[in-house]
Amino acid sequence: MLKIAWGITGCGDKLPEVVEIMKKLKNKYNLDVDIYLSKNAKIVVKWYKLWQVLEDEFYDLRVEVNANAPFLVGKLQTGKYDLFLVAPATANTTAKIAYGIADTLITNSVAQAMKAKVPVYIFPPDNKKGTVETILPGNKKLTLYMRDVDVENVERLRRMEGIEVLDKPEDIEKVILKHIEVKKQQ
């Protein structure tokens, strides 16, 4: 069984889509998924009325207390998880990771996972120039205009060893399938 640590940041952009995809993949591939939320993710997830959805589907939601609590780093480094998925990732989280700042649960866990060669996958919606259409609570559409600095930070992530940037929520399934194949060969 594939074991995934799923980090959620305070990014509302594409959050409903990511949650739906993770629910589908968990059931389709019988995944073992533990969710770790940043402090702001808790606020945003509740604003989108997705807290109960996550709790019903994934049971145990762990919310950041500080950069080391809950102790995700230890679980990543001791092999409890096959991969660390951060989706969606805020522009702030992306910038911190791009510049080596590890002062939150998610950014510290990414840094430490990389040091232990645990595969890290990050979906930052701000990943290319132009616009992104997202859905707000109440199904209202919002067009976001990407800032050059955010796109540049995503490009920095793409060049980092140990991180794979996902361009869209649908890319998560490709990652899952790749790791399922690896597990079969072990």
UniProtKB/Swiss-Prot annotation:
Gene Ontology biological-process annotations: coenzyme A biosynthetic process
NCBIfam families associated with the record: archaeo_AfpA
InterPro entries the record matches: Archaeoflavo_AfpA (IPR014072), Flavin_trans-like (IPR036551), Flavoprotein (IPR003382)
Family: To M.jannaschii MJ0208.
Protein name per UniProt: Uncharacterized protein MJ0730
GO molecular function annotations of the record: FMN binding; phosphopantothenoylcysteine decarboxylase activity
One protein family per Pfam: Flavoprotein
GO CC terms: phosphopantothenoylcysteine decarboxylase complex
